[in-house]
Every structure is written in structure tokens, then in C-alpha cells.
Amino acid sequence: QTLTYDDIVGTGLANKCPTLDDTARGAYPIDSSQTYRIARLCLQPTTFLVKEEPKNKRQEAEFVPTKLVTRETTSLDQIQGELKVNSDGSLTFVEEDGIDFQPVTVQMAGGERIPLLFTVKNLVASTQPNVTSITTSTDFKGEFNVPSYRTANFLDPKGRGLASGYDSAIALPQAKEEELARANVKRFSLTKGQISLNVAKVDGRTGEIAGTFESEQLSDDDMGAHEPHEVKIQGVFYASIEPA
């Protein structure tokens, strides 16, 4: 069914990934002599968990649920890249282009708000070896880059920035005052994240696949001013496999 702009605007539908019927339990054959691409990869997060330090020192830190406070613009979409067949029969997806990042803010139970850049930039994800077809038992696992939430020209409330602004907003800070130095000296950090894509539905005729994903990455660190939080993101995904 074709929807118009008026049908979609203000409903949140634009943030949802396409889905496949529950009966889509087929297989998409892979020919090692051919090359393939993954197109229209869409990642729709449904749960954001943040690792919280326990109040009791005898307990271990654990991921706790949060509340999303960002508007309906959290999904990654139109991601594409090469799907390579390796010598051991495994498949490797290399992300090349697409809407591969979204700034997101979540709120913890105590009221603290955690900004993060939900992303899969430069994702390289591989399957298990000896894959002759993509089925509901196929899993992709890999790493991606997590850029800084802020860019070089961002100025904080005191006018400090990486490429512009004041060098310091403190009159005469102590030489060994590390906390003040971290706030003054801005840094563009690039960290790593991990993701697993678990295929649950396959349309062997069209090459469409769908399933669930779980991603782990770090939150924003305010350009080095404080320690980032560990964030776990869970959701659903959709993609299309096609010959290159």
C-alpha cells in the first residue's frame, strides 16, 4: 500500500523499518563465484540500556533500561555495502554508505540524561564459515567506528571548543587539576563498537532478510570532559541482498 506524505507525517512511521511476513522462512543461495551487495539495511532500535554502577560495592555493574527522550528519528536506513564471499565460506559485509548515524538521548531512572551517537560507521561484520545460503540460522557479527557526538566547531556553554573558541574558561587553574584540564582541552574521540545481526526471516525469492540486532558502544564523553557510559542497543533490522 502506497502512503502519502500526509499519511506519514507526525505518525512515527518514517522511523520504522520494513518487515517480512512470519512465513518468510526460506533460504537465499550463495554462489561463491558471484559477488553480492547488501542494500537498504535498516536498523530500528527498540531498547536502550545503559550500564549503571551499583550503589552496593558488592554488586556488579549491570545494564538498566532507559527512557528515550529523542523524537522519532532514531533509525538507521539505506545502508549499503559489499557482501564478500571468503575463502573459508564465510560472508563479510563491509558498510560503505547510507544514513549510518543518529544522535540520540536517553534518560535514566534517576533523571540523568545520556547522549550518544547511535551508529554503524565502517561496519565490518562476518558470518560463520561454510555458508552456502543465508537462512534463519545465519548471524553477522562485527565491529564499527563510533565518532565523537560533537564536531570540531562545537562550542560548549563557556565558549570552549576544539577548532575554535576559548582555550580556557578558568582564570588560573591549578597545574595538577585534571578535571579542569579535561573540560578545557577538547578531544575528538573515535571508539569502537560491536554488533550482532541475527537473521530470523528470509525471502529466498526477493533476497530480503529481517531479524534482530544487539549493539554495544560508548556514549558521548563531552569531548573528553567526562567518562562515557557503556550502552547496549537492541532492536530489529531489515535488508536486501542482491547480486553486484
Swiss-Prot record:
Name the job this protein performs.
Answer: One of the extrinsic, lumenal subunits of photosystem II (PSII), which stabilize and protect the oxygen-evolving complex. PSII is a light-driven water plastoquinone oxidoreductase, using light energy to abstract electrons from H(2)O, generating a proton gradient subsequently used for ATP formation. Required for dimerization of PSII and for binding of PsbQ to PSII.
What's this protein's name?
Photosystem II extrinsic protein O
Source organism, top-level taxon: Bacteria
Q: Which SUPFAM superfamilies match?
A: OMPA-like (SSF56925)
Q: Which Pfam families match?
A: MSP
Q: Which GO terms describe its cellular component?
A: photosystem II oxygen evolving complex; plasma membrane-derived thylakoid membrane
Alphabetically sorted, this entry's keywords are: Manganese, Membrane, Photosynthesis, Photosystem II, Thylakoid
Biological process terms from the Gene Ontology for this record are: photosystem II assembly; photosystem II stabilization
Q: Which GO terms fall under molecular function for this chain's record? A: oxygen evolving activity
InterPro entries the record matches:
OMP/PagP_b-brl, PsbO
Task: Name the membrane topology term.
Answer: Peripheral membrane protein
What family classification does the UniProt entry report for this protein?
Belongs to the PsbO family.
